[in-house]
């Protein structure tokens, strides 16, 4: 352990974290990973451009959700999400991920007039033994709310 944080101090902080109720306030994004096999690429009939062929999908909580997931991984007693999602498919996926983490969602709202912020992250993958290895990230697609957050959600 580095000098600025002795091991004993870190152990004490992590032990105390188990008894805390931590609220994470912010923008919760869905990180949507699309693992593509480049050997299966084919041209689009509509545009002639390349169509990436997805062989696996993964979902994770992003942005404030990453902070919440890290607190859970560190053993925080209770982690509450304070924010909102849209009433859309991405929102349901984000909620499923959050529930899988065990986050408290009492302060997490569904807003019908908002998108669930999403980073769609396609990448090329290769087989690596029994699993997959990311070879190259492709162009990301961002879904964000471009209008100010309504007061009722702030």
State what each model feature region is.
Residues 4, 19-22, 30-154:
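Conserved N-terminal subdomain of the carbohydrate kinase-like
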